[in-house]
């Protein structure tokens, strides 16, 4: 009895409040895959040379640079999802439905961070690995 109570408390601690955590996971959709990418200075400009001002647009350009233009940073990893143009077009909507802290968004827009992107069926989460 004592160990099962401890286990429940431990699970609630790591997961927030049990049912809330399950709901959040369901809201994201099923997990697809993850990748890491360095968002370098060239990822902050579109193919017309115009400056990008949103985190989603910068991440999308990183994937276009990777797959379309062959412009890859040493830390960039492949993913199967955003290799397709039509899926890259969904990136902004997916980030709106997903998660990224204001600190992560600021680091992307104002710097050249190394990020991790977790891709789900309907959303994505972006975390900062290093600035």
Regions found by a protein language model. Name each.
Residues 49-104:
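Mature extracytoplasmic domains of secretory-pathway proteins
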Residues 1-9:
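Bacterial N-terminal signal peptides that target proteins for export
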Residues 106-130:
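Short, exposed beta-strand-loop hairpins at the edges of beta-sheets
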Residues 18-27:
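Sec/Tat signal peptide C-region and signal peptidase I cleavage site
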Residues 26-27, 97-111:
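Short, solvent-exposed secondary-structure boundary motifs
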Residues 8-17:
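Bacterial N-terminal signal peptides
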Residues 26-63, 113, 123:
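Charged, low-complexity intrinsically disordered segments
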Residues 5, 43, 86:
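Solvent-exposed, flexible loop/coil residues
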């Amino acid at each position: 009895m004592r160990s099962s109570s401890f286990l429940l408390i431990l699970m609630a601690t790591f997961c927030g409040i049990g049912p809330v955590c399950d709901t959040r996971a369901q809201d994201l959709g099923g997990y697809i895959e993850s990748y890491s990418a360095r968002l370098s200075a060239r990822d902050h400009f579109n193919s017309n040379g115009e400056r990008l001002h949103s985190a989603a647009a910068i991440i999308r350009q990183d994937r276009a640079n990777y797959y379309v233009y062959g412009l890859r940073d040493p830390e960039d990893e492949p993913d199967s999802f955003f290799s397709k143009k039509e899926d890259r077009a969904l990136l902004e909507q997916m980030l709106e439905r997903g998660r990224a802290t204001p600190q992560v968004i600021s680091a992307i827009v104002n710097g050249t961070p190394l990020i991790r992107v977790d891709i789900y069926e309907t959303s994505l989460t972006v975390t900062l690995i290093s600035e």
